[in-house]
Amino acid sequence: MRATLHVSLGLVFLTVAACSSSSTMVANSCGSSGAAANINATDAKVFSPSTATITHGQSVCWQNNGSSSHTVTSNDNTSFNSSLPSGQIFVHTFPTAGSFPYRCTIHAGMTGTITVN
């Protein structure tokens, strides 16, 4: 009886541990983010593609596929701003229509625009 209790408690612990680790997993690629547009930040110091058009309420996902760190910063410095280390993603939802130019604050000339209808 005691051995059965220990085995049962062990299985419960393993199940909880497995569930808790999977529930803390985050998307590690834009493909699994559900975003309407995916943009790559590259070691060539460009966003590719540099423009995207979405509908308000949709999201854009930026992924750093290179080895250099980047940022994704709206030109007004208030709409969105995130660091983008190598291998990471940043997802932003655009609630309103408009044109949203952005840049990497680390690399001059690394720019793009999101158009939201």
Task: Indicate where each model-derived feature is located.
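Extracytoplasmic copper-binding redox domains, predominantly the cupredoxin/blue-copper superfamily
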Residues: 14, 19-117
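Sec-dependent bacterial lipoprotein signal peptides
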Residues: 1-18
